[in-house]
């Protein structure tokens, strides 16, 4: 049984039902029927469409989704036709030919031929009408892709955590599909992971890894905390040790983990500073109760929840025509948490562009 689900939003194209994945290429031959879905952006879509035109095809749309679907479909047709003619000419009865084609169809070769000219980041999944399945990842590893293989099932997802949660497994059981590799599964359940092209220099997308990924992934969580902690020296220099008159906060919600990392980094800095001050006073004989109170009880980093955002409201994926209205009321502030003499330090993890409606808000 093959099940698929696609929850990614479109980065281009139209906001209508017809633009949703998966895309289908139907025929009355199971081994020529194709379904494609995934997380990808091709950087050379015009060139790929021109290649189809020079081949004699007539692309109806200029999207990379159509390009991927039609390119794989073309090489699938070629492989199917070659097998059909060979089997027909060998004298095999017509009703037996579809099953023979299905068993002989080489998914790896089809994908290898299809992806020769692709340039971009992609994690693409697809299925053929006979029950064969494939999943491939770009040679730079720009888009994330993970898989889980057990005795009962094979599952694939962009991120590690959904597989861990749904199938109740440990993180070590979920593997990352290497760049330039594909997972192919035949209809009979046999499967393989093979290279379909040459791996290139690793270049994972920071948007995918830091902003868009689920924050409860163990690796992503550590990376986000480290990202916040790395800001510690800059914050210390800008505040000049005035922690008692500073409030640390974050925006948007995805910045929360990095915010914890920043607070942790600032507290480690403060502990080291206090330790050094106390040691120096102890050696000089100037350690007294007032100094202990000043060093231990005062000037520690203070965190505040300043910006409140309705987590159900996604301004980033809202269409431009309604974004201004949504942004104007999706955020609110905590009143009275910051005084007129306080310095507000806001950790902003927005890796996307700030639209004009956001600036106005």
Region locations from a protein language model:
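Residue-level detector of conserved catalytic or cofactor/ligand-binding positions
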Residues: 2-5, 349-360
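Short secondary-structure boundary/capping segments
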Residues: 52, 140-142, 150-152, 262-269, ...
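A short acidic (Asp/Glu
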Residues: 135-138, 146-147, 256-263, 355
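Hydrophobic alpha-helix feature that most strongly marks membrane-spanning transmembrane helices
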Residues: 232, 236-240, 253, 263-271, ...
